[in-house]
From Swiss-Prot:
Cellular component, GO annotation: cytoplasm
InterPro entries reported for this sequence: DnaJ (IPR012724), DnaJ_C (IPR002939), DnaJ_domain (IPR001623), DnaJ_domain_CS (IPR018253), HSP40/DnaJ_pept-bd (IPR008971), HSP_DnaJ_Cys-rich_dom (IPR001305), HSP_DnaJ_Cys-rich_dom_sf (IPR036410), J_dom_sf (IPR036869)
Name by which UniProt lists this protein: Chaperone protein DnaJ
Name of the encoding gene: dnaJ
Keywords attached to this entry: Chaperone, Cytoplasm, DNA replication, Metal-binding, Repeat, Stress response, Zinc, Zinc-finger
Notes concerning its domains: The J domain is necessary and sufficient to stimulate DnaK ATPase activity. Zinc center 1 plays an important role in the autonomous, DnaK-independent chaperone activity of DnaJ. Zinc center 2 is essential for interaction with DnaK and for DnaJ activity.
Subcellular location, record wording: Cytoplasm
CXXCXGXG motif repeat ranges per the UniProt record: 146-153, 162-169, 184-191, 198-205
Source organism of the structure: Coxiella burnetii (strain RSA 493 / Nine Mile phase I)
Residues the record lists as binding Zn(2+) 1: 146, 149, 198, 201
Assembly information from the UniProt record: Homodimer.
Length: 374
């Protein structure tokens, strides 16, 4: 039986934050944990499935591999055994693993590092930049490791083991039949205390700074696409690993083209004489101009497809087309002389209207039949 998508298992979207993933798993763990459903095999399977999904989506490296390769990208992590590779643990251990400050942080009696927060940055591009790709320098306000104490929070000394929890970061408490772990109130889950805080970062191990980064934009990117820069988010507290930076792309509207997938669309206005008699015209594309032949008797709404003049697909490399939508423009602000010529021309057309304006004639015939049948 094929494995379900991890995001589907937890009921979160692809952009879910770590906090949202934890919240979703907590809800499922409370519902399906075997301690709450003794003897229920279906609940046991669902709990294992949820825990496996949580273990992957809350680990930035595993999640990146899963997002790129699917289950195959993390199979080695679980030895191909699926969710069966996980133990249940008691509810206290689970909550301690998920909810840090509430239930104590890490498993196995070790303090859990507080990873830095992920950051989001909106990058606005022109259509040309999105289609052709480029490198763009961005400036991101963030937290970086303190250079004075190298992120430890202690200047000129090392942090000491917490005397309250003996370095575990947690205090185990008994609540009825449940045994839960609570964060140590002295070290706040770190397992260490700082006796001589760094004066530059006030013992946090990090400082605020605007970071300058170069972002490589691949050709074919579009609005809604996201670029992940691993480790470029906020620095963690007390030397903990940094978060990631997600660059969210938004492409500005273009005066000539609008994009649909890998195809570009453009309205091409022509005068009514060119529509009737035909002609040639220069058509702009994102790679220069091309000549388009307008055949005689071209009607408004006619589409011409210029193959290979669209966008190169971001992943497959296939190239879309440029689709030109013909708009026949009615002349305006005519002089009296021009109006006279048009009236004479109209009279000439009426002599053989069925041949010159078949759609108009057919439309009037249909209208006549419609009212006659009433």
């Amino acid at each position: 039986m094929a494995k379900r998508d991890y995001y589907e298992v937890l009921g979160v979207n692809l952009n879910a934050t770590e906090a949202e993933v934890k919240k979703a798993f907590r809800r499922l763990a409370m519902k399906y944990h075997p301690d709450r459903n003794p003897g229920d095999k279906d609940a046991e399977v669902k709990f294992k499935e949820a825990r496996e999904a949580y273990e992957v989506l809350c680990d930035s490296r595993k999640r990146a591999s899963y997002d790129q390769f699917g289950h195959a990208g993390v199979e080695q992590t679980f030895g191909g055994a699926g969710a069966g590779g996980f133990g249940f643990g008691d509810l206290g251990d689970i909550f301690g693993d998920i909810f840090g400050d509430i239930f104590g942080g890490a498993r196995g009696g070790q303090a859990r590092e507080q990873r830095g927060a992920d950051l989001a940055y909106e990058l606005v591009l022109s259509l040309e930049e999105a289609v052709h790709g480029l490198s763009r320098t961005i400036k991101v306000p963030t937290w970086i490791n303190c250079k004075t104490c190298n992120g430890s929070g202690a200047k000129g000394s090392s942090p000491a083991t917490c005397p309250r929890c003996n370095g575990s970061g947690q205090m185990r408490m008994q609540h009825g039949f449940l045994q839960v772990q609570q964060t140590c109130s002295v070290c706040r889950g770190r397992g260490q205390v700082i006796k001589d805080p760094c004066t530059d970062c006030h013992g946090q191990g990090r400082q605020q700074q605007t970071k300058t980064l170069s972002v490589k934009i691949p050709p074919g990117i579009d609005t809604g696409d996201r670029i992940r820069l691993a480790g470029e988010g906020e620095a963690g507290l007390f030397g903990a690993p940094p978060g990631d930076l997600y660059v969210q792309v938004r492409v500005k509207p273009h005066p000539l083209f609008h994009r649909e997938g890998n195809d570009l669309h453009s309205e091409v206005p022509i005068d009514f004489t060119t529509a009737a008699l035909g002609g040639e015209m220069e058509i702009p594309t994102l790679d220069g101009s091309v000549r388009l032949t307008i055949p005689p008797e071209t009607q408004g709404g006619k589409q011409f497809r210029l193959r290979g003049k669209g966008v190169k697909a971001l992943r497959s490399g296939a190239v879309g087309d440029l689709i030109c939508h013909i708009v026949v423009e009615t002349p305006v602000k005519l002089s009296p002389e021009q109006k006279d010529y048009l009236k004479q021309f109209a009279e000439l057309l009426k002599k053989d209207e069925k041949n010159h304006s078949p759609r108009t004639r057919n439309w009037f015939d249909s209208v006549k039949d419609f009212f006659t049948s009433k």
